[in-house]
């Protein structure tokens, strides 16, 4: 019997080498992805720690400024607010065309829908036009965080997608340096350079009727007159908590 070694055909040899190369490439790509994800997680954790420190420092500074003002016998004057949260509290009946267009512009197309709005001269004028149909005010860090975590959805290809994974946020906002849900929250809170992109990515929040009702006999009177609509400043946080 011949002891001669059976040779592998050249085509089979090439195929085997190609398969080996592909397997090596897959392993290398997997290792690279794992390393990249590990690095990304470290970046996100580092940013989150920095954000938390930033929020706590800002809160302490305000408390100290109020104490200093009181000690000096004066009043603490807050910096001008840059952000409001607006909730639509009236349906479609008896709304004139112009306010209706503004509600659509601000993406407040349904009752109990809410959006963040950057405070500018132009947006303040828009809010005046729709004031009888909305409640708005200055959201706290806690309110913004709870809204995004509990009610946050992204707008992807005109679809409402839950923010269940940071990868969803990175895929849509990564080019702006927004990699995680906490990056997104920070961009909203600070009204950062990419606020417009971050805010447009967020689907308008769908809130519930306030737990325990509106608590006022005349819902469609101004807030300062004992009603519900208009600017309620920091009291918007209490309303959102009841609706979230």
UniProtKB/Swiss-Prot annotation:
Compartment annotation = Cytoplasm
* Residue ranges, compositional bias (Polar residues): 1-11
Single GO term (MF):
RNA binding
Kindly state which keywords UniProt assigns to this record, in alphabetical order: Cytoplasm, Ribonucleoprotein, Ribosomal protein
- Region Disordered, as annotated, extends over 1-21
What are the recorded Gene Ontology BP terms?
cytoplasmic translation; maturation of LSU-rRNA; maturation of LSU-rRNA from tricistronic rRNA transcript (SSU-rRNA, 5.8S rRNA, LSU-rRNA); ribosomal large subunit biogenesis
Sorted alphabetically, the Gene Ontology cellular component annotations on this record are: cytoplasm; cytosol; cytosolic large ribosomal subunit; nucleolus
**InterPro entries this protein is in?**
Ribo_uL30_ferredoxin-like_sf, Ribosomal_uL30, Ribosomal_uL30_CS, Ribosomal_uL30_euk, Ribosomal_uL30_euk_arc, Ribosomal_uL30_ferredoxin-like, Ribosomal_uL30_N_euk
Membrane spanning stretches: none
Domain of life where this protein originates = Eukaryota
Pfam families attached to this UniProt entry: Ribosomal_L30 (PF00327), Ribosomal_L30_N (PF08079)
Major localisation = cytoplasm
| Other information | Present with 7080 molecules/cell in log phase SD medium. There are 2 genes for uL30 in yeast.
- NCBIfam families from the xrefs? uL30_euk (TIGR01310)
Role noted for this protein:
Component of the ribosome, a large ribonucleoprotein complex responsible for the synthesis of proteins in the cell. The small ribosomal subunit (SSU) binds messenger RNAs (mRNAs) and translates the encoded message by selecting cognate aminoacyl-transfer RNA (tRNA) molecules. The large subunit (LSU) contains the ribosomal catalytic site termed the peptidyl transferase center (PTC), which catalyzes the formation of peptide bonds, thereby polymerizing the amino acids delivered by tRNAs into a polypeptide chain.
* Subunit description: Component of the large ribosomal subunit (LSU). Mature yeast ribosomes consist of a small (40S) and a large (60S) subunit. The 40S small subunit contains 1 molecule of ribosomal RNA (18S rRNA) and 33 different proteins (encoded by 57 genes). The large 60S subunit contains 3 rRNA molecules (25S, 5.8S and 5S rRNA) and 46 different proteins (encoded by 81 genes).
Family as reported in the entry's similarity comment: Belongs to the universal ribosomal protein uL30 family.
UniProt-recorded name of the protein: Large ribosomal subunit protein uL30B
| Organism, as annotated | Saccharomyces cerevisiae (strain ATCC 204508 / S288c)
């Amino acid at each position: 019997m011949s002891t001669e070694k059976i040779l592998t055909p050249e085509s089979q040899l090439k195929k085997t080498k190609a398969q080996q190369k592909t397997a090596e490439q897959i392993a290398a790509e997997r290792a690279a992805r794992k390393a990249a994800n590990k690095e990304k997680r470290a970046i996100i954790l580092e940013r989150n720690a920095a954000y938390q420190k930033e929020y706590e420092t800002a809160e302490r500074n305000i408390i100290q400024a109020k104490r200093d003002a009181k000690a000096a016998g004066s009043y603490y004057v807050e910096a001008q607010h840059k952000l409001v949260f607006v909730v639509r509290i009236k349906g479609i009946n008896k709304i004139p065309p112009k306010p209706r267009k503004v509600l659509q512009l601000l993406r407040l197309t349904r009752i109990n829908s809410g959006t963040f709005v950057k405070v500018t001269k132009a947006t303040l004028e828009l809010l005046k036009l729709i004031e009888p149909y909305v409640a708005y005010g200055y959201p706290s860090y806690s309110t913004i965080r709870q809204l995004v975590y509990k009610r946050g959805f992204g707008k992807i290809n005109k679809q409402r997608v839950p923010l269940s994974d940071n990868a969803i946020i990175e895929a849509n906002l990564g080019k702006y340096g927004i990699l995680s849900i906490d990056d997104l929250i920070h961009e909203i809170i600070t009204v950062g350079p990419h606020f417009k992109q971050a805010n447009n990515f967020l689907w308008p929040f769908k809130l519930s009727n306030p737990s325990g009702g509106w608590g006022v006999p005349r819902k469609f009177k101004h807030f300062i007159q004992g009603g519900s609509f208009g600017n309620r400043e920091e009291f918007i946080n209490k309303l959102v908590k009841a609706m979230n």
